[in-house]
């Protein structure tokens, strides 16, 4: 079949203070979160260009905008997604392909399940909507960006974080 929608949603963390971070911790996060974005998109972009249609949605993170102590590798990988998204959007717009990013805040996932109750409460207390997000919150905006309703939106980042980062 023809691929017209690509969602790049890779993400791992290997948190450590930079002075203690190993090259392996740095490289594993950059390779998974950023280099995979390049590799997967490159596999599908030619087909989308030929078909003159497509939606590419890159999942970043609120940490890509705000930074976070102990996450220089993760925040670097996620902030680079914004430049990739904007540059690619300019490259492929003439072929009716949109490229956008979504920056989730703290979402209930396997990654956030590893946090202690105290850590979760500290995070929730900093979120104006006073709750963590759900996978459905991210799915809803992803469906919108993949739809014809978003055909005039490209090169953008949509924050879905309950007001944590404004």
Language-model region placement:
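Active-site helix of classical SDR
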Residues: 41, 77, 85
């Amino acid at each position: 079949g023809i691929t017209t929608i690509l969602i790049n949603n890779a993400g791992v963390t290997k948190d450590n203070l930079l002075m203690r971070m190993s090259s392996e911790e740095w490289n594993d996060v950059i390779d998974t979160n950023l280099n995979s974005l390049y590799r997967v998109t490159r596999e599908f972009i030619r087909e989308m260009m030929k078909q003159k249609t497509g939606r590419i949605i890159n999942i970043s993170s609120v940490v890509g905008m705000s930074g976070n102590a102990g996450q220089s590798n993760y925040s670097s990988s996620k902030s680079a997604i914004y430049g990739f998204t904007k540059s690619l959007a300019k490259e492929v717009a003439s072929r009716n392909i949109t490229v956008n990013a979504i920056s989730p805040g703290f979402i209930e996932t396997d990654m956030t399940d590893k946090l202690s109750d105290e850590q979760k409460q500290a995070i929730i207390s900093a979120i104006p909507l006073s709750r963590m997000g759900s996978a459905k919150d991210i799915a809803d905006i992803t469906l919108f960006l993949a739809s014809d309703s978003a055909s005039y939106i490209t090169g953008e980042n949509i924050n879905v974080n309950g007001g944590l980062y404004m």
